[in-house]
Amino acid sequence: MNEIETKTHTALHIVKGAVVKVLGEKAKWTASVYVSGNHGRLTVKFDRKPTPEEIAEIERLANEKVKENVPIHVYELPREEAERRFGEDMYDLFPIPPEIKTLKVVVIENWNVNACNKQHTKTTGEVGEIKIKKVRFRKSKELLEISFDVL
């Protein structure tokens, strides 16, 4: 993963935190993620298409978190300890194989917690501006796709 993809991947965690703040706990389950260069896509389980105002608020909150330049903590923990400490919120809809006994857990305090083995920036400020480019709601699967670029 190169430097720009590290920033874009970190932006996924920032956008996810903003999505949950704006749309609520019903949007907390990530179905898939995609990163290519400065382009990212976050897909979460959700039951409706967000309003334009909600999308604007997600982008605003994400960029506010970038400007706050808060630290990104990565903890490498035995799986049982990670589960005790962070609970189900650190997981996504795609399972981590049971034979994985040590987890890396990425934490942006009061924003996002996620078991993730990718590279991340040390702070949110290193990411740069996040611009939401496209939002697609797939009603039949109840999936919300948010595509963004890191500028």
Place the predicted regions along the sequence by residue.
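Active-/binding-site microenvironments in catalytic and ligand-binding cores
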Residues: 1-151
